[in-house]
């Protein structure tokens, strides 16, 4: 072995020996493992550092000092550092937190004293849903399904926007589709399994329905369009539709040529390689007759029409507190298991406490409101209180663009908590629109039974109405 290699080897051995000696002679308790044990459990050396967490600036609303069971709405707008306090319940929250959430959801921060136990989540803001964006700035969609509201097993919702001339491409799906036009105008088109055709133009407030499996297309007219889609399957996804582009892209060109009567293979050279979903297109002709294509089977009979011009219909019920406009298979037969109500609630008024016997409800706020059962809020600000049996009850807050879902038989009310009208749609999977009004129920029950059960006086029970009130003035 060369002398320089031998010298380097000897030096390495000496260094290793020195490290071993240093390690064996190290003072006890200086290693990382040993010192960390002094932080486990009680040790008088680990003194507590007291901090005054109550020393925060905040203010309470007058309603927060009332009996918690009164449960008045808490408007935290302009309130300094809102706190989770109701009557004698709750306590201070020094943070960390985002007070914007508390302002939007005051009944989560400081719930009424009547809330109790657990109720499955019944609210989802579509603004928190992932937006699926179309091509060429032609539009977008966002959805709510069981991924967002797990209890919403019967229905799912999609909010879709098409810019002027924009298409929702030719497609079909395994779920039935019920739709309400929120704003703008749209041309809808479909072909049945018998070869009958359908085309119509719809405006804000109108409704359409396509049965499961029926292919259809949508195109926005001048000014664009936005609409709510409700599907009869809580797990429905916009990503699971059957698309015309994919039908052509996923079949061999030779088969396409045979299928269409011997067209040359070159006819398929420029078909899209995948989905278009939402894309810009040639503006629809002003004269709808130009797109009224008819084969030997003719057009769909009027009584089986896929559209209903609900915007032209009168309100079903008008009260001092608002109005209700009902559409169900009695007036729109093709939608055999979709019933809905467009509800307007004036500030301070309440959609009376009720429940649905036939189905769950999905609700959505439209312009500034909400939907129940399956509901969608169009406009306004509201809260829904849900009683779910076994002593369980919970209150949820809703704003424009929010969805709600209330399972069958659970009582609920919708209270307008803002200064503008609340407008929402409640959609049922039912062959007619119906509910059980708590007010009418006790009003039509012998007074003695009600007084004995609820410990109420005769003067109180005598004020109960024998007819549904639908929307009660605040």
Where are these regions (language model features)?
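Fungal secretory targeting signals
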Residues: 1-28
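A short, N-terminal "cap"/entry segment at the start of jelly-roll beta-barrel domains
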Residues: 26-154, 258-342, 456-474
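Ligand-binding loop in jelly-roll beta-barrel domains
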Residues: 26-29, 34, 203-204, 209-244, ...
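Glycine- and acidic-residue-biased ligand/ion/polar-headgroup-sensing regions
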Residues: 164-167, 172-194, 347-392, 400-402
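Short coil/turn segments at secondary-structure boundaries
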Residues: 172-175, 191-194, 222-223, 232, ...
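Active-site-adjacent segment of 2-oxoglutarate/Fe(II) JmjC oxygenases
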Residues: 224-285, 421-474
């Amino acid at each position: 072995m060369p002398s320089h290699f031998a010298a380097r080897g000897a030096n390495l051995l000496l260094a290793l020996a020195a490290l071993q000696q240093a390690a064996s002679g190290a003072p006890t308790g200086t290693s990382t493992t040993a010192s960390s044990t002094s932080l486990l459990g009680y040790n008088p050396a680990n003194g507590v550092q007291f901090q005054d967490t109550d020393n925060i600036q905040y203010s309470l609303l007058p309603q927060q000092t009332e009996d918690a069971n009164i449960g008045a709405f808490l408007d935290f707008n302009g309130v300094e550092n809102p706190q989770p306090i109701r009557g004698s319940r709750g306590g201070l929250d020094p943070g960390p937190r985002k007070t914007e959430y508390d302002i939007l959801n005051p009944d989560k921060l400081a719930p009424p004293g009547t809330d109790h136990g657990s109720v499955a989540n019944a609210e989802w803001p579509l603004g928190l849903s992932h937006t699926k964006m179309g091509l060429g700035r032609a539009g977008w969609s966002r959805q709510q399904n069981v991924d967002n509201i797990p209890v919403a097993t019967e229905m799912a919702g999609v909010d879709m926007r098409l810019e002027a001339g924009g298409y929702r491409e030719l497609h079909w799906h395994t779920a039935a589709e019920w739709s309400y036009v929120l704003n703008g105008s749209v041309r809808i088109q479909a072909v049945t399994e018998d070869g009958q055709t359908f085309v119509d133009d719809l405006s804000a407030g109108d409704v359409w329905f396509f049965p499961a499996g029926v292919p259809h297309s949508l195109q926005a007219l001048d000014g664009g369009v936005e609409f709510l889609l409700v599907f009869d399957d809580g797990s429905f996804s916009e990503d699971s539709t059957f698309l015309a582009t994919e039908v052509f892209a996923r079949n061999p060109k030779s088969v396409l040529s045979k299928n269409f009567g011997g067209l040359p293979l070159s006819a398929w050279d420029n078909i899209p390689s995948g989905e278009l979903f939402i894309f810009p297109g040639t503006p629809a002709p002003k004269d709808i007759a130009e797109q009224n294509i008819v084969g030997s089977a003719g057009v769909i009979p009027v009584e089986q029409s896929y559209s209903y011009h609900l915007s032209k219909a009168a309100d079903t019920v008008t009260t001092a507190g608002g109005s209700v406009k009902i559409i169900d298979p009695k007036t729109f037969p093709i939608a055999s298991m979709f019933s809905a109500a467009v509800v307007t609630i004036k500030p301070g008024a309440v959609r009376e406490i009720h429940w649905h016997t036939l189905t769950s409800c999905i609700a959505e706020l439209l312009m500034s409101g909400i939907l129940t059962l399956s509901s969608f809020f169009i406009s306004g600000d509201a809260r829904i209180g849900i009683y779910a049996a076994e002593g369980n009850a919970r209150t949820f807050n809703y704003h424009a663009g929010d969805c709600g879902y209330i399972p069958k038989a659970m009582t609920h009310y919708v209270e307008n908590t803002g200064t503008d009208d609340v407008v929402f749609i409640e959609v049922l999977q039912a062959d007619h629109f119906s509910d059980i009004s708590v007010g009418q129920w006790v009003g039509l029950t012998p007074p003695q039974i009600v007084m004995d059960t609820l410990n109420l006086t005769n003067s109180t029970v005598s004020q109960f109405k024998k007819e549904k009130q639908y929307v009660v003035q605040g």
